Amino acid sequence: MKIIKRNGAEVGFDITKIIIAITKANESVEEVDRMTPVQIQRIAESVELQCQKMNRAPTVEEIQDMVEHYIMAHGAFEVAKHYITYRYTRSLVRKSNTTDDKILSLIECNNEEAKQENSNKNPVVNSTQRDYMAGEVSRDLSERILLPQDIVEAHREGIIHFHDSDYYAQHMHNCDLVNLEDMLQNGTVITGTLIEKPHSFATACNIATQIVAQVASNQYGGQSISLTHLAPFVQVSRDKIRASVRDEFDTVGVAVTEDQINSIAEKRLREEIRRGVQTIQYQVVTLLTTNGQAPFVTVFMYLGEAKNQQEKDDLALIIEETLLQRYQGVKNEKGVWVTPAFPKLIYVLEEDNIREGSKYWELTKLAAKCTAKRMVPDYISEKKMLELKVDKNGNGHCYPCMGCRSFLTPYVDENGQPKYYGRFNQGVVTVNLPDIALSSGGNIEKFWRIFDERMELCHRALLCRHERLKGTLSDAAPILWQYGACARLKKGETIDKLLYGGYSTISLGYAGLYECVKYMTGKSHTDPSATPFALEIMQYMNTACKKWKEEHNIDFSLYGTPLESTTYKFAKCLQKRFGIIEGVTDKSYITNSYHVHVTEEINAFDKLRFEAQFQHLSPGGAISYVEVPNMQQNLEAVLQVMRFIYDNIIYAELNTKSDYCQVCGWDGEIDIVEEDGKLIWRCPKCGNTDQDKMNVARRTCGYIGTQFWNQGRTQEIKERVLHL
């Protein structure tokens, strides 16, 4: 059995340390108040047994809480008092050196929490370690100085989650839609160098990757770019290649027709498109930003964005090449084609491509083939977006999420024109819904009273995020605020006007709707008798956001939180505060946002239909998924799910497995098994358990994770049932 030390390191459980600690406290009291060695032994054994029942590695703090409980249960109150005093004294010593232990454990690569915090960061790499070290300092400053203590305590206790506190000390925002069109058409500046409008498609792709890297280094969340903004440069290259071909034939004195010139030019153009798309794919997965990871970037593929038919056809060529290259994958260090995590791809389903026989149907079939093998693209329904994302003029709009799932709300600028690219999200604070339910003890009046208190806590925490950005000078991130990614402000100008009036959003996240409803009603939120209560909770949070928006002129919106590592933290906090409650706190994870519980038997179509009503009530962003087996030999079923998505839900994805064992070459599913009280990954063919010698890709929270996960998320992945 393992335990987690305060610095995040994972070590073996040692019962003698508990015995020694209790004995020291025991020897410091009068003899009449002392416990016997047998009693001390029993306490230590009780703690050991309780730790074993947790089915995860307990923390030192949790073990000490157990020790206190059992000492007092034995009636040894004087011993307990001395034990608590000693513990408090040691805590004061540690607080005087708040970050040293954690930073040292990061450098020595024995911090288990850091290793499993982010499934797309490799904590062994120097650049990632530097980011984690900076994050520890930022988190420490934020918790000791910058944030109100009640918000810090609520975050520590898992009552709320103040996202990305390791970046809070700096004036950074969350995620955005990069205005690539403006930057390519009007030029931009990268690290002091003027980048003018590109004169070819290949150059435009290269510039786009440089922009992506710069943007990622100046924010902590995801970003999205649209292939539509690259499409005009296909015609630029076409004209350039035609002129070159004509010149070549003129030089050698050979007479050719325009059709012959066009035929040769199109072949060369296809090769340039291939190279340009390859540049984006390989640059994105090989670049390391200042965040110590590849850019969290989403590539949006929407034929309906094209300005004319020629641009739409050229966009179709880019989309086709993007899908072909993603289907192929990238090679790992063994030279085997595997699934890359980035860029995330989103394909928009629309009337031009969703019906068999429609103009771009072949593209949709290729997308289905790619999804079945590589888990992307994910799918957005133009039909549902136009129906549900309606601006104040009554017009519906289809546009990408910012990175993983965070959606902007509809917005019309001062000229009455819709605007999406160049807008951003200020930050997220998530409320732990099961904690509200458990704190109420099942009393509905108390539940809503506590809900109000938690909403106000989140409100204040979100305003902290907002105030941290307020007054930020455009000079803090020129690529974002001065050179087009988000705006073209003057040097020395603040970004304040972009924080109000709906230009940017700020998100109230929520997690564990299933567990919350389960505790309050005794039933899953899919049960017809419990669904109205679940929807009432959703509406309650939306009402709070509307109230705050009117009060501050800031666009608060409700967001279905993708808990990656936080799912484990929330679960541990709930177990610590309320114990193990069957169906509510008996897992090492809690359910993302409104999702159907991963163990619940439900078919893909019923799941998407059920979750669609909750997605509509999450205007700040949400995504639904269905878990499927290997579908490469059943593409018709994939297409059937895609057609259902088009007609029923805004945004959804299909999850499958994509693994490879570098020891024996196994390319089926890598198993999750329990060993010494810990979940590990093991090749079913050769038994390899070395994570450095296997490639495992799983959907974590909208993105594909490839660097493994903490114990909570790993248990959630293990317990997922298939929906097809």
State each model region's role.
Residues T23, H459, L463, Y514-K518:
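Amphipathic, well-packed alpha-helical segments that form the structural scaffold of globular domains
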Residues K685-L724:
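Long insertion/accessory domains within large nucleic-acid-processing enzymes
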Residues I15-I19, G75-E78, K307-L315, T521-S524, ...:
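Short amphipathic alpha-helical segments with coiled-coil-like heptad repeat character
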